[in-house]
Each structure stands twice: as structure tokens, then as C-alpha cells.
């Protein structure tokens, strides 16, 4: 099933109710099998209709749609309300792979990828990007992730496939992405084609008309978001598909532009989720050489690496690890085996070393 099954997710209460209700209902039916409670046929019909109505109302009011959260996040993403995705996930956790992909994307969009990644259950590559997407939502979110990490051509391809596979080859949301990608790559005639299509739709007309001035190459080059995307365009030929070979495709992007923050964060997030600390430390050495600041998540992983994988005090001291992070890690090492699991999770559940020690490593796709 595409819906999450993860050690950190509690078993839903509804499953327990179903298991308890089945023997109870069977016992009641056996007990009343030969009894007659209502003799008039008219009353029998009324009672049956009332019970049917109650069942229908209960089904409508208390149903749990497994895709509800994913569609909610898809709606927020369409409006660009990324903070609402993060806030909802904090309040209700995450119940679906597509929802988790949107959540991780929202963390990247809001600049909280490194600070909040370990606050939510991670399931591996399937939580970062859909694998070989075919559905409308899969293609949309794959295009969103590719756009975020700077692989513009991949974002364009996913959007184009989504448009072709939609009814009457019309999918305004993906057409907007096609306009954006064509503007970034300087294919102005292709961009104008989709601008014309969107201008014929009253709902998207204003947005499409606002893009028309960007069909001029000079105006386009001076637009901030386009300049930012062009600055991160791949330099070397990158034939790898993000949805099939995610870490390798990201490595190409990082090698081309070390300052591509979203691609770097996704790449480091992938390595940490799969507990590949050796490869992770290769990138940490490069960060150290560039004199960059280390997020707390990376500091925690570095502490774990030098404590459990390669004990080298001198090398450890060469990294800018804050005293607070070191003290918390030492406290964790001291109480990890003696503290009750619930208390340990409450105190250290948002740290990388807790994840590495107690959460099973996802299987690679």
C-alpha cells in the first residue's frame, strides 16, 4: 500500500473498534436470532430506514479518507501556502506518502528542512519524491520537487507528461509550470503558446497576462526569480531521472552548484535518512572548507560519526560543533540504555542520533 506503515505511527483506534465489534455483534445476533421485537410490518420498515439513515450519517461524518491529507497539501501547494502544510503536519502527523513528499517540500520552501526533518517520520526516498510517477498528483509533486532542487528540464518533462495525460490535454496548473520552465530556459515561443491557452481561461487569465512582459529576453533576464533559477541550471550533462535514481541525480546538481541549498539539503537528508554517514561526511568536509555554518542536524550527525564510526578526536575538533550540541549528545549517550523509551523519545526524539539508534533504516528502492 502507498499509505504509510511506520513504527512511529500509532495503530488507529478504528482498527481496535472493528476487532472488538465483530465478536460482540456476532454474539448479539446469535442471542436474538429467534426473537421477534417488532410485529407490525410498517414499524419494521420505519426502524430499518432509521437505522440505515443513522449508518449513512455516521459514515459521512466519521469517515477517514486516506487521500484527504494528500489532497489538502496539494491544495495548499497550489496556493503557495507552504507554512499551512507544516502547521497541519505538526498538529495531525503524516498519514500518506504523497503528503510526506509535500511536507518535506514545504520544509525546503520555508527554510526548515534541516531544523525540522527529524521531527517527522521519514520513510526514505519515497518520502522525498514519487518513484516513476504516472498519476496526476505524482507528476505534479515530482515537477514541484524537481523545480525546487533546480533541475528545470525534469520539472518541465514531468509537467509536459502530466498535461498530455490529462483530459483533453488541459491541465492549467502544469501549464503554468511549463510557462515558468520555458521562460527560464529562454524558449519564449513555447512559453507564449501556453500563455495564450491560459489567457483563454478566466481563472488563469490574470496570471498568464502578467507573464507576457517576460517574453522579452531583456525583461525576462532582469526578473529575480528567473535569474535565480538560471544561476542554478546544471552545467554538466545530467541524464539521470530524479524519480528513478534520486541521490545520483542530486549529486550532479550539487557538484555543479555547491550553493544550491535545496538540492544540497535534499541530498544530505537522503544520506541521513539512510544512515550513510561516510558519504555524508564527504560533503561535510567540503562545507568545512567553504567556511559554511553547520545546522544542528548536521552537527548531531557529525557527533554520532566520530563517536560510533571513526573515533578521531582531532578531526572532530576541526568541525564547528557547538557546546550545546555536544553536551546534549553526551547526555543521550549516558541515558540511552537506562531511560524509559517514552521519556527518551520525548527528550531526544527530534535528534538525528535518536533516529539513527532507534528507527529502522528504510529499504532502498
Which residue stretches match the model-derived regions?
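Membrane-embedded alpha-helical segments of integral membrane proteins
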Residues: 1-37
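Internal/C-terminal transmembrane anchor helices
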Residues: 40-65
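Soluble catalytic regions of membrane-associated enzymes that act on cell-envelope
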Residues: 59-240, 247, 255-274
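Terminal, low-structured helical/coil segments at or just beyond the last alpha-helical repeat
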Residues: 252-253, 312-365
Amino acid at each position: 500500500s502507498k499509505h504509510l506503515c511506520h513504527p512511529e505511527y500509532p495503530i488507529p483506534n478504528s482498527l481496535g473498534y472493528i476487532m472488538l465489534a465483530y465478536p460482540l455483534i456476532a454474539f448479539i445476533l446469535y442471542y436474538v436470532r429467534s426473537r421477534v421485537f417488532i410485529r407490525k410490518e410498517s414499524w419494521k420498515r420505519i426502524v430499518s430506514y432509521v437505522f440505515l439513515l443513522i449508518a449513512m450519517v455516521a459514515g459521512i461524518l466519521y469517515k477517514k479518507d486516506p487521500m484527504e491529507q494528500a489532497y489538502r497539501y496539494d491544495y495548499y501547494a497550489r496556493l503557495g501556502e507552504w507554512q499551512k502544510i507544516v502547521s497541519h503536519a505538526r498538529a495531525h502527523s503524516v498519514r500518506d506518502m504523497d503528503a510526506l513528499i509535500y511536507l518535506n517540500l514545504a520544509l525546503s520552501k520555508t527554510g526548515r528542512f534541516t531544523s525540522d526533518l527529524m521531527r517527522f517520520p521519514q520513510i526514505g526516498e519515497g518520502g522525498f519524491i514519487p518513484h516513476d510517477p504516472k498519476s496526476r498528483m505524482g507528476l505534479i509533486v515530482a515537477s514541484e520537487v524537481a523545480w525546487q532542487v533546480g533541475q528545470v528540464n525534469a520539472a518541465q518533462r514531468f509537467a509536459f507528461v502530466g498535461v498530455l495525460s490529462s483530459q483533453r490535454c488541459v491541465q492549467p496548473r502544469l501549464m503554468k509550470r511549463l510557462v515558468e520552465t520555458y521562460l527560464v530556459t529562454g524558449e519564449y515561443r513555447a512559453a507564449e503558446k501556453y500563455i495564450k491557452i491560459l489567457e483563454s481561461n478566466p481563472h488563469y487569465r490574470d496570471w498568464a497576462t502578467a507573464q507576457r512582459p517576460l517574453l522579452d529576453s531583456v525583461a525576462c533576464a532582469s526578473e529575480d526569480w528567473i535569474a535565480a533559477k538560471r544561476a542554478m541550471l546544471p552545467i554538466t550533462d545530467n541524464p539521470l531521472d530524479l524519480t528513478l535514481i534520486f541521490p545520483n541525480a542530486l549529486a550532479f546538481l550539487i557538484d555543479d552548484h555547491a550553493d544550491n541549498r535545496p538540492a544540497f539539503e535534499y541530498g544530505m537528508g537522503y544520506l541521513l535518512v539512510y544512515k550513510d554517514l561516510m558519504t555524508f561526511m564527504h560533503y561535510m568536509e567540503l562545507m568545512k572548507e567553504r567556511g559554511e555554518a553547520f545546522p544542528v542536524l548536521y552537527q548531531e550527525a557529525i557527533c554520532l560519526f566520530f563517536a560510533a564510526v571513526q573515533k578521531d578526536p582531532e578531526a572532530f575538533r576541526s568541525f564547528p560543533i557547538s557546546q550545546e550540541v555536544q553536551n546534549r549528545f553526551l547526555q543521550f549517550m549516558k541515558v540511552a540504555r537506562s531511560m524509559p523509551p517514552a521519556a527518551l523519545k520525548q527528550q531526544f526524539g527530534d535528534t538525528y542520533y535518536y533516529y539513527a539508534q532507534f528507527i529502522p533504516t528504510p529499504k532502498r528502492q
